A protein has these predicted regions:
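N-terminal secretory signal peptides and thylakoid transit peptides that target proteins
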Residues: 2-19
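C-terminal segment of N-terminal export signals and the immediately downstream linker at the start
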Residues: 25-44
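Active-site-proximal cap/lid insertion segments
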Residues: 36-40, 47-63, 70, 79, ...
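Anion (oxyanion) recognition and catalysis
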Residues: 72, 148
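Residue-level detector of anion-binding/catalytic polar loops
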Residues: 77, 153, 418
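His/Cys-centered metal/cofactor-coordination and adjacent catalytic loops
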Residues: 104-143, 201
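Short, surface-exposed beta-strand/loop micro-motifs that present aromatic residues
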Residues: 144, 225, 408-420
């Protein structure tokens, strides 16, 4: 049965309404405050390559995630939440800027080394350009710097991934405390990326904890930071490396997990099952670490005045469970872009709710700015909006479109229409009836396809013209 075709007028009205609604919502400033006026603390937790169904609360039946399930029960779970890129670096850049990768300049990975360790990357991975080997444009204003207006102290514990030269490190971008690694991946125990040390404390490389599991280290440092700053507003950003595969020389690369967690699952009967168990164990170890962070907030009596945000940086890879979505990390299908997400904010967001509204990670930056009572940087265009009213069930999402580009791969969602044109497949899909993107409607709906392509061309031009300052060159 074919899907009715919207008229051109209706289609353009949708796009126009989207722009107006986004513009209006960016100016909304409604944030509940604790008695005494102290702005809320902020805890942002990001997992790495976690599958859409790698959580009990998202329908997963195999992985134990009691603490994340509890977080969802205490807040709202987002079922229709997207990131801006199907892999690491640009997704993280958008979180910290509230802007499309194409607008903030971080539209590809920062490798920081030639990946020639016997692993056959595609030819484009070897291209050496300043944009790929340096870091995020230093003219971009990141979330922690904006929050300083309200007296926040900010720390990051885990994966940075926005440049390893000193001028790109977290302390130069507004953070006050950093313990973690700077590249896209790491060995969970040696803290090396393909044999090269990658861990930093603040501005200096360190091997002080070599041999200790990274999830435990990032938990430890985040706990320390929250303890030390319990009497002032803080942003604690914890981007775990779990359950990303380890960046080691051996092949196939494993997902490393403590033996006790591996043994807590049924013994695998094959190599494939063993790899899946490693993945599950790494997720459960991370879940336990998150449980410790949430427990400390309760112990310090900060939980009622702390916003907690959790999501995965992109779709799952390896043995992750992305069902019922098509595709995986690196792809423009839903399995690469739609991710698990939950938000807890007592007093602002009802507990135990589910939000099916169309939202993205670019909404987090303006939401947190509004919650803190600070204005975004003057003259900076945000591509997101404060989603608090949406999460509270008080308003529908003003977002009507989202567009993606990863090198030659392109995709766009307008309302419930999703267009994909990529090396892994292409098509036009109606997500209202086909979340698995199994039925290509491009031949049945050629007018819709052409209109979305035309909108994508307009967006591409908008992004090219958005920054009159010119491309970033820091060399």
């Amino acid at each position: 049965m074919s899907t009715p075709t919207p008229s051109r007028r209706d289609f353009l009205r949708t796009l126009g309404a989207s722009a107006v609604a986004l513009s209006a919502s960016r100016g909304a400033m409604a944030s509940p405050r604790r008695p005494g006026g102290r702005p809320p603390n902020i805890l942002v937790i990001v997992s790495d390559d976690q599958g859409y169904r790698d959580l009990g609360c998202c329908g997963g039946q195999t992985i134990r995630t009691p603490h994340l399930d509890g977080l969802a029960g205490d807040g709202v779970r987002l079922t229709n939440f997207y990131v801006t890129w199907p892999a690491c670096t640009p997704s993280r850049g958008s979180l910290l800027t509230g802007r499309y990768p194409q607008r903030n300049g971080t539209y590809d990975m920062y490798r920081n080394e030639k990946p020639d360790y016997g692993y056959k990357y595609p030819p484009e991975e070897y291209a050496v350009t300043p944009e790929r080997i340096l870091g995020m444009d230093t003219r971009e204003v990141l979330l922690p710097r904006v929050l300083k207006q309200a007296g926040y102290r900010s720390g990051i514990f885990g994966k940075w991934d926005l440049g390893q030269l000193r001028r790109f490190l977290p302390l130069q971008r507004g953070f006050d405390d950093f313990y973690g690694y700077v590249n896209t991946g790491i060995d969970y125990y040696t803290h090396e990326r393909y044999g090269v040390p990658s861990m930093y404390r603040n501005n200096e490389p360190t091997t002080e904890d070599k041999g200790t599991y990274t999830t435990d280290l990032f938990q430890r440092e985040a706990l320390r930071f929250m303890q030390e700053n319990r009497d002032r507003p803080f942003l604690c950003y914890v981007p775990f490396n779990a359950p990303h595969i380890a960046s080691v020389l051996e092949r196939p690369r494993p997902v490393q997990a403590p033996e006790a967690y591996i043994e807590s699952y049924p013994k695998p009967k094959s190599k494939d099952e063993a790899r899946r168990v490693e993945h599950m164990a790494a997720v459960t170890a991370m879940d336990d670490a998150i449980g410790e962070l949430l427990a400390l907030l309760e112990e310090l009596e900060l939980a009622d005045n702390t916003i907690v945000v959790f999501f995965s940086d992109n779709g799952g890879s390896g043995t992750a469970d992305n069902a019922p979505l098509r595709g995986r990390k690196g792809q423009m299908f839903e399995g690469g872009l739609r991710v698990p997400c939950m938000v807890r904010w007592p007093g602002a967001i009802p507990a135990g709710t589910v939000c099916d509204e169309f939202l993205t990670s670019m909404e987090i930056f303006p939401m947190l700015c509004n919650a803190a009572g600070v204005a975004p940087p003057d003259g900076v265009v945000l591509d997101g909006f404060d989603m608090t009213p949406v999460l509270a069930g008080k308003a529908p999402s003003p977002r009507k479109e989202m567009l993606w580009q990863r090198r030659g791969d392109r995709a766009a969602r307008v309302e419930n229409w999703k267009w994909v044109e990529s090396a892994k497949g292409s098509g036009l899909f109606d997500l209202s009836t086909d979340i698995g993107e199994a039925h290509d409607l491009s031949k049945e709906q050629p007018e819709v396809l052409e209109r979305i392509k035309a909108r994508f061309a307009e967006w591409t031009q908008e992004m090219a013209e958005a920054e009159p300052r010119g491309p970033f060159r820091d060399y």
